């Protein structure tokens, strides 16, 4: 397994729409394993393949309590139904150090393939619903800052660009924690 570079906003590759996975094979499973290792190393709870520069519809998540690991791999995930609305603070490994309130569906039903290529469906609410929506947004080229006002987006972009100049964050991969 390998730790991959995490792309940092405003890297244009974060805006690409990921291609569906045609076949779940050893390469896709290796990608998922590398993404999990990268996510754990960065102390995140979710990571989309587009965040590591791979244009495939693959997401990894782990919402377990600290210390316990319950990795989840979603291949070709899609949301089937949304209900309600809830606002909560979100962060992103591609926008390190920034957290903002974002409104999302309170409950969702989604489907995906597992790491063996088997289809499955699940209903989710709370943190899991937020995380699934956030990561699928990445696969569609959308970031949580897109839900913010233009003023807030510009402020975050300027601050991140300053961190890049200071060498604390490297566009194309993280070199430090913001």
Swiss-Prot record:
SUPFAM superfamilies: Peptide deformylase (SSF56420)
Pfam family, one: Pep_deformylase
Originating species: Alkalilimnicola ehrlichii (strain ATCC BAA-1101 / DSM 17681 / MLHE-1)
Keyword Iron: yes
Endoplasmic reticulum in keyword set: no
Function comment: Removes the formyl group from the N-terminal Met of newly synthesized proteins. Requires at least a dipeptide for an efficient rate of reaction. N-terminal L-methionine is a prerequisite for activity but the enzyme has broad specificity at other positions.
Annotated Gene3D superfamilies: Peptide deformylase
Name the record gives this protein: Peptide deformylase
PANTHER family: PEPTIDE DEFORMYLASE
Cofactor note: Binds 1 Fe(2+) ion.
UniProt similarity note: Belongs to the polypeptide deformylase family.
Gene: def
Alphabetical GO biological process terms: co-translational protein modification; translation
Co-factor requirement: Fe(2+)
Domain of life: Bacteria
């Amino acid at each position: 397994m390998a730790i991959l570079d995490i792309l940092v906003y405003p890297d244009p590759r974060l805006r690409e729409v990921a291609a569906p996975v045609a076949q779940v094979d050893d390469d896709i499973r290796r990608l998922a394993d590398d993404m999990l290792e990268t996510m754990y190393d960065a102390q995140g709870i979710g990571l989309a393949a587009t965040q590591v520069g791979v244009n495939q519809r693959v997401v990894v998540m782990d919402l377990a309590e600290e210390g316990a690991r319950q990795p989840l791999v979603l291949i070709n995930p899609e949301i089937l139904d949304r209900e309600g609305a809830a606002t909560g603070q979100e962060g992103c490994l591609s926008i390190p150090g920034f957290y903002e309130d974002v409104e999302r569906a309170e409950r969702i039903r989604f489907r995906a393939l597992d790491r063996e290529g088997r289809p499955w469906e699940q209903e989710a609410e709370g943190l899991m619903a937020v995380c699934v929506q956030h990561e699928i947004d990445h696969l569609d080229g959308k970031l949580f800052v897109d839900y913010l006002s233009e003023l807030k987006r510009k402020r975050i972009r300027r601050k991140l660009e300053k961190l890049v100049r200071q060498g604390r964050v490297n566009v194309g991969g993280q070199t430090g924690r913001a």
